[in-house]
Swiss-Prot record:
The gene is cysS. One of its GO terms (biological process) is cysteinyl-tRNA aminoacylation. InterPro entries: Cys-tRNA-ligase, Cys-tRNA-synt_Ia_DALR, Cys-tRNA/MSH_ligase, Rossmann-like_a/b/a_fold, tRNA-synt_1_cat_dom, tRNAsynth_Ia_anticodon-bd. It comes from Thermotoga neapolitana (strain ATCC 49049 / DSM 4359 / NBRC 107923 / NS-E). GO terms for molecular function: ATP binding; cysteine-tRNA ligase activity; zinc ion binding. This is Cysteine--tRNA ligase. Its cofactor is Zn(2+). It catalyses: tRNA(Cys) + L-cysteine + ATP = L-cysteinyl-tRNA(Cys) + AMP + diphosphate.
Amino acid sequence: MRITNTLTGKKEEFVPLQPGVVRMYVCGPTVYDLIHVGNARPAVVFDVFRRYLEYRGYRVIMVQNFTDIDDKIINKANQLGVDPKMVADTFIAEYWRDAHALGIRPANFHPRTTDFVDDIVEIIEKLVERGYAYQTKTGVYFDVRKFKKYGELSKKRIEDLIAGARVEVDETKNFPLDFSLWKRAKPGEPCWNSPWGEGRPGWHIECTVMSVKILGESFDIHAGGEDLVFPHHENEKAQAEALTGKIFAKYWMHNGMVRFLGDKMSKSTGNIFTVREAVKKYGRDGLRYMILSKHYRSPMDFSEDLLSDYSKAVRRVWEILRRYESNGVTGIPKRNTVYEEYVNRFVEALDDDFNTPVAVSILFELAKNLSKSMEEGDQENALLFYHLIRREFGPVLGLFDLNEERREVAGESLLGILIEVRETLRKEKRYDLSDWIRDRLRENGIILRDTPSGTEYSVE
C-alpha cells in the first residue's frame, strides 16, 4: 500500500510503526453549527480509509476530536444568549445525527477538548520549562523560532512567513508567528485555573494533547483537510516534537477542499450546503458517491445539479439490487478466477494512494454485470456480482451496504403511485381527494407542481 505523505511530498509505502496496528488521528469539527458538505468530505474519506485498512487486516485505533471550546462557539453562545457548553453539546448531538445519516462509523475515541484541560496545562508547563514557550500578559505562546524544524510539514520558511488571517496579532508576542497555547480569560468567557491565571487552551495545543494522550507520543497517521496544513497541523507537529523529541506522526494525509459557488465551502463565509439538506434531498449514497468519485487529494466542485446526477446513478444501482433481492438471496459464491480478478483490481486501486474513483467505478461495473447476468439467467455470476457489491466492496466504501436506501427507493415508488392516483382523480374531477393527497404530501415536506407535461415534485 502506498499513500502520499504531505510531510515528504512523496508517495510512500505504508508501514505502520507497530506491525498489524494502525493508529490514526483525524481532526474533527468545531461544534457551533450543522456540518456541511465540506466537513463531510474528510469524514467520508477517512471513514472509508479506516474501513479499507480493516479490510486489509489491520487493527485500527482511530481518534476524532470535538473542539468544544473556541471563539466561534463563544460568539455563537453570545448571539443566542446561551451558555457555550449548551452550544457545544447541541451541535455534538446534531453532528452524530448527520454522521449517522451519512453512514460515518464512530471512531474508537471522540475526545472533547474540555475533558483534557488538566493534561493541556501540564504539557504547556513542560514546554515553558524547556524554553519552547513563554508567558505574556495575554497568555502563553509557543516560540516558533526555538523549534528548528518549524515549517517542515507545510514547506514554509519562517523568514518568508508573515502574520496572516489565521495568525493571532498580539503586540505582547516575541514574534508575529508565535501562537497561543493558553489564552487569558476575558470577562464572561468560560475559563479554567492554570499557573498563568484563569483562561482556556489555544486551538493548536488541543489536538496535540488529545492525540499524544490517547495514541502515544508517535503514531502512524494524522489526517484532515488541506486547509489545516498551515498553521494548525504545522503547529501541532511543532508542539509535540518540541515536547517529546520524537516524530509526532509518521504519515500526514490531507484531502482537497470542496468548492461551492466558486469558492471554498466554509461556515465562516456562509457559503455552505448542509449534510442534512444533501442527504434529505439526494440520499446518503448519493453524497458518499459524489465524494468518493474524486481522488481525495483533488479539489471537489459541488453543486446540487452534480449531486442530483450522482444520486440518480446510485438509484439505478439500487434498482438492480432490488430486482435481484426480490427473488430471495441465498448461497455463497465460489471463490473463482472472476472473484479473484475483481478483488485484485479493487485492492490495487485502493493500495495506490487510496484511489477511490477507480474503486467506485468497479462497484458500478459489477452492478452492470449483475443486471446482465440476471437477464441472461446466469445465476452463478449474478450471485458473485451481488456478493461483491453488497457484502464485500460496498461495506468498504460505505455504499449499498445498508438498507436505508432501499427504504428510500420504496418511498419513491410509493410516491409515484400516489401521484398517479392523484392524476387519475383530477381527470375524474374529484378535486377534494386530489387536493387532500397534495396537502398531506406538503405537510410531509413534498411539494407537488402540476405542469403541462405532468406532475413534478420537490422535497423541502
